[in-house]
C-alpha cells in the first residue's frame, strides 16, 4: 500500500484507527525477528529496559523500518509530507506470560502538544487475539481526555501501570496482525492489549510519528528522527542514523535520548519502575 484510500482516511478521521496495513512479507519480518533475537543471544537474554525505547538509534534494521516507504506513505496521508519519528518502543510478550497493557491514551503522558501524533504498531511476529494483540475503542480520540490512574501493577507493561478509570469497553475492536503488517492509530485513542496465551513470543514495535510543528511540553530537550520532508520549526534535535548495529556514535546519543524519554514518561510519578 502507498497512500491511503479515501475510505480509510475517513475511518481514521472518524474512528481513530486503521487495522492491518501490509508493510512487508512474513518472510521479511522473520529476518527482522532473527536479527533481533540474534542480538538478544549476544547479551544472554531479552532486551534490557533502556533498549526497548528509541532503539532505531541502536539497530540499523529498525532505522530502516522507520524510513520504509511502506510505513511512511500511509503516515503522510494522515499528517502531511513533513514527518518526524518521536520514538519507537518494543512490546515483547513471552509465550504464556502475564504481561498486559491496560487501557490508556498516550497523549496523557507523552508531553506532546499536537493531537495529530500517529502510532504505527508493527508486528515482527504474528499478533493474534490469543497472543494478546492490541485492541482499541473507536472514537475515543476526540473530545476530552479520559481520567487515568497509576496502579504500578507489576504485570502492566506501561511505565507506571496506568489505566483509564471506569472505561466502557463494550465497543472495543481487536486488531490482530500477521508478521509484516502494521496498524495505525491516533495516540489520543484508548487502546490496550491482553496477555500472550499462545506458545510463541509476541514481538512488536510501535513507531510514533508527528508533524514537525509539535512541541515537547514536559522537558526542555527532546529529539526525533526527521524521516521525510523538512523541519522548519526546530523543536526537536535531529537524531543521527546508525551505519551498523550498535554504532558507537548512535549508542552514545541513545543514552541521552532514552534518558529524556524516561524523564517525560515518569514525570509526576510516585514510583519509577524502570520499564524503559
Language-model regions, residue ranges each:
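Short, surface-exposed loop/helix-turn segments at secondary-structure junctions
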Residues: 105, 158-168, 199-201, 219-226
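Feature marks short, surface-exposed loop/turn motifs that line or immediately flank catalytic pockets
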Residues: 27, 94, 128, 143, ...
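Non-heme Fe(II)/2-oxoglutarate
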Residues: 42, 189-276
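Double-stranded beta-helix
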Residues: 129-194, 214
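Non-heme Fe(II)-dependent double-stranded beta-helix
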Residues: 1-112, 149
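Proline-centered turn/helix-capping motifs that create local helix->coil transitions or kinks
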Residues: 41, 79, 126-129, 141
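Residues that flank catalytic or metal-binding motifs in active/ligand-binding sites
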Residues: 58, 86, 116, 130-132, ...
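Short, conserved beta-strand element in jelly-roll/cupin
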Residues: 104, 111-129, 176, 184, ...
Amino acid at each position: 500500500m502507498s497512500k491511503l484510500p479515501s475510505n480509510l482516511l475517513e475511518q481514521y478521521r472518524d474512528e481513530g484507527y486503521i487495522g492491518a496495513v501490509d508493510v512487508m512479507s512474513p518472510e521479511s519480518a522473520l529476518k527482522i525477528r532473527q536479527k533481533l533475537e540474534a542480538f538478544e543471544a549476544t547479551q544472554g537474554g531479552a532486551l534490557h529496559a533502556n533498549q526497548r525505547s528509541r532503539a532505531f538509534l541502536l539497530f540499523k534494521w529498525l532505522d530502516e523500518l522507520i524510513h520504509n516507504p511502506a510505513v511512511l506513505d500511509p503516515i503522510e496521508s494522515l499528517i502531511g509530507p513533513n514527518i518526524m519519528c518521536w520514538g519507537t518502543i518494543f512490546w515483547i510478550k513471552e509465550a504464556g506470560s502475564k504481561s498486559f497493557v491496560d487501557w490508556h491514551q498516550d497523549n496523557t503522558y507523552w508531553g506532546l502538544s499536537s493531537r495529530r501524533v500517529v502510532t504505527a504498531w508493527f508486528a515482527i511476529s504474528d499478533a493474534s487475539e490469543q497472543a494478546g494483540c492490541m485492541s482499541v475503542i473507536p472514537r475515543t480520540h476526540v473530545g476530552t481526555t479520559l481520567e487515568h490512574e497509576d496502579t504500578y501493577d507489576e504485570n502492566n507493561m506501561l511505565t507506571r501501570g496506568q489505566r483509564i478509570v471506569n472505561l466502557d469497553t463494550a465497543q472495543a475492536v481487536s486488531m490482530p496482525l500477521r508478521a509484516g503488517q502494521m496498524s495505525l492509530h491516533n495516540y489520543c485513542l484508548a487502546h490496550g492489549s491482553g496477555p500472550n496465551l499462545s506458545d510463541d513470543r509476541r514481538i512488536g514495535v510501535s513507531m510514533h510519528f508527528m508533524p514537525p510543528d509539535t512541541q515537547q511540553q514536559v522537558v526542555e530537550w527532546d529529539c526525533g528522527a526527521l524521516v521525510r520532508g523538512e523541519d522548519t520549526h526546530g523543536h526537536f534535535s535531529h537524531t543521527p542514523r546508525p551505519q551498523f548495529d550498535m554504532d558507537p556514535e548512535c549508542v552514545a546519543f541513545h543514552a541521552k535520548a532514552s534518558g529524556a524519554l524516561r524523564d517525560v514518561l515518569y514525570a509526576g510519578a510516585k514510583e519509577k519502575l524502570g520499564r524503559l
